[in-house]
């Protein structure tokens, strides 16, 4: 089978560098444009099934790309829940929160954001969702629209990097990745391939 991975388009919260996971922000004008560019790119690509996170920013992106084709939403592939850090910028955090965040970024497998989702619970949730997608779509071409953290977990799972590789897979908005998956072999056609080539890329 072949898996295509897309991160949702830009939101105003992305533009402001805010922390958010389950906060249900929609994509902004730039995000809509990114999704439209991806829609045009995927018109040339055969897709049998489309899955999306149930959060608005991913689903809206998927709906634009799908261009009328059906989409199956999956809560399992939504982003990490940030707890009390949801909908905040670095500047809006207390000094104590900033210290904890720095610690979390170096020991994310063992530390949990205040009132948030434990990383390994998140990782297992997402990868179990990906396993279901693979199990139910053998031999098919599948598009998955999700979030940066969730997509990173998926790439970690596919490559065998595991949770320790979490920071090694940063999915850009307006780009896609494509992976051939079989029982014996994993082959990346591309990672962060632009929907539209722009000057300087």
What kind of region is each of these model predictions?
Residues 11, 150-151:
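Short active-site segment of divalent metal-dependent hydrolases/proteases
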Residues 41, 64, 68, 132, ...:
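Active-site catalytic microenvironments for nucleophilic, acid-base chemistry
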Residues 15-18, 81, 99-113:
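Short, basic/glycine-rich phosphate-binding loops at helix/coil junctions
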Residues 3, 133, 140-146:
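Generic beta-sheet signal
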Residues 3, 7-61, 113-126:
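Loop-to-helix element that buttresses phosphate recognition and phosphoryl-transfer chemistry
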Residues 74, 82-92, 135-141, 156-201:
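Acidic, low-complexity terminal tails and accessory targeting/binding regions
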Residues 2, 70-72, 187:
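Conserved beta-strand segments of alpha/beta enzyme cores
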Residues 38-100:
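Phosphate-coordination/substrate-recognition cap region in phosphate-metabolizing enzymes
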């Amino acid at each position: 089978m072949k898996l295509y991975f897309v991160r949702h388009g830009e939101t105003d919260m992305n533009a402001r560098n805010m922390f958010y996971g389950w906060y249900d922000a929609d994509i902004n004008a730039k995000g809509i444009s990114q999704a439209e560019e991806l829609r045009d790119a995927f018109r040339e690509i055969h897709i049998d099934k489309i899955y999306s996170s149930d959060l608005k920013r991913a689903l809206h992106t998927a709906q634009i790309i799908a261009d009328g084709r059906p989409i199956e939403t999956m809560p399992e592939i939504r982003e990490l829940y940030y707890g009390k850090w949801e909908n905040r910028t670095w500047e809006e955090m207390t000094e104590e929160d900033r210290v904890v965040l720095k610690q979390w970024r170096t020991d994310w497998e063992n530390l949990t954001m205040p009132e948030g989702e434990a990383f390994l619970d998140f990782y297992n949730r997402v990868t179990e969702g990906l396993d279901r997608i693979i199990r139910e779509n053998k031999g098919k071409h599948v598009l998955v629209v999700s979030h940066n953290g969730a997509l990173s977990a998926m790439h970690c799972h596919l490559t065998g990097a595991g949770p320790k590789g979490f920071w090694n897979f940063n999915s850009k908005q307006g780009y896609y990745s494509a992976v051939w998956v079989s029982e014996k072999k994993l082959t990346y056609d591309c990672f962060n391939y632009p929907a539209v080539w722009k000057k300087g890329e």
